[in-house]
Amino acid sequence: MEPGLQQAGSCGAPSPDPAMQVQPGSVASPWRSTRPWRSTSRSYFYLSTTALVCLVVAVAIILVLVVQKKDSTPNTTEKAPLKGGNCSEDLFCTLKSTPSKKSWAYLQVSKHLNNTKLSWNEDGTIHGLIYQDGNLIVQFPGLYFIVCQLQFLVQCSNHSVDLTLQLLINSKIKKQTLVTVCESGVQSKNIYQNLSQFLLHYLQVNSTISVRVDNFQYVDTNTFPLDNVLSVFLYSSSD
């Protein structure tokens, strides 16, 4: 072919548009475009699975701790000869479960009160103490915990009434509680009042423990007879 024709042929051939030129491998395939989404979904799956496993493990640990706590709780279902109403039963159970049972007592108030110094039923529970004429007499020296609870029933008239509860050691007041009821002067059928007092005191041998009230006629021995109690136990022995 002549040189002129070759030049014309080469000039007549359309040259490719630069905009239409695509580098090899630069065309994204549909499979290649979904790879980032798959990677993200896998990350979320692994994260949620790990969180679920941690939650299951935490619940299992909590259940194990609860079961161990229940197993370590002492069984206090032993039947007691005396049954109270509000807290006297719990107090009696606490006394029975004390580590030191060398000296303790649990007494209920007598229904036949005729003195400000209260008397107690002699058929109560007494260990290491002697009961005589309203007194508990100490037989072992040491630190004693004393608690008394009384229920009062007052029929108000036109004057106020003072209710007292006094804990005495060797006939001397060591702790007392005073409550005034019927202050308004308005007549009412019944007013129930609970008084309680406790004392932690070191006692020698032959020391006496007693309880005194000013108005013994208001001590309610009928409605809640089992809630009028005196409890004593040796907290710490000196021997």
From Swiss-Prot:
CDD domains: TNF. The keyword Thylakoid does not apply. One of its GO terms (molecular function) is cytokine activity. The chain crosses the membrane at residues 44-67. The lineage of its organism: Eukaryota, Metazoa, Chordata, Craniata, Vertebrata. One of its GO terms (biological process) is defense response to Gram-positive bacterium. PANTHER family: TUMOR NECROSIS FACTOR LIGAND SUPERFAMILY MEMBER 8 (PTHR32163:SF1). Keywords: Cytokine, Disulfide bond, Glycoprotein, Membrane, Signal-anchor, Transmembrane, Transmembrane helix. Residues 68-239 are extracellular. It is a single-pass type II membrane protein. It comes from Mus musculus (Mouse). Residues 103-230 form the THD domain. Belongs to the tumor necrosis factor family. Its main location: membrane. Glycans are attached at N75, N86, N114, N158, N194, N206. One of its GO terms (cellular component) is extracellular space. Residues 1-43 are cytoplasmic. Homotrimer. Cytokine that binds to TNFRSF8/CD30. Induces proliferation of T-cells. Disulfide bonds join C156-C182. Residues 1-36 are annotated as: Disordered. It comes from the Eukaryota. InterPro entries: TNF_CD30_ligand_type, TNF_CS, TNF_dom, TNF_ligand_SF_member_8, Tumour_necrosis_fac-like_dom. This is Tumor necrosis factor ligand superfamily member 8.
